[in-house]
Amino acid sequence: MASSHSSGTFTDAGPDDAATRRNGKRTLGDVQGTLLGLAHYLFNFVRGEAASRPALREQATELLRVRMWGIEADEPHRKALAAGDLILVFLGAPERKFIGQAELASAVHDWTPFEAQVYPGDSRGGVLLAEVEEWDPPVPMSTVLSQIDPAENARADFEAGIVRVTANEYETALAVAAARQPRAM
């Protein structure tokens, strides 16, 4: 469900299947365009087939709160995801809004029996999340795109549930989110 499909790309920062790893960890320079060996991804969440399920944002928020994200076997970048990678959580069309960010606490794995009981979806495996931050208000993709150089060819729609993004795209989304947060008095 979390990896259903929409259409287009934000800017897929390129393939990472050639990334070399040492001792199970990504090393500096493994993947072009990464910051200190970390990769940046957009997790694209779109409406599942069942109309009786809760609204899109509530479904995605539930995954963030349990700190788990289901990843299907055919998902692009599945094998490249590693603990420490950074993600943006995006609600696909028609919402087209970022609702948070997180750090991956694990690589993709089959759920343990305990994780399978806790996970609110139907995926057989996925990643664990750490440093989860929900964004309220959510950040419209159009606002982020307006801050990115048009030469980067960033777009708002995606065919894949996981899209590799550049460090600049990731940092731009964080900056826009920070500027939108209510200020404490």
Which positions does each model-derived feature cover?
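Compositionally biased, charged N-terminal/linker segments
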Residues: 3, 10, 14-16, 20-83, ...
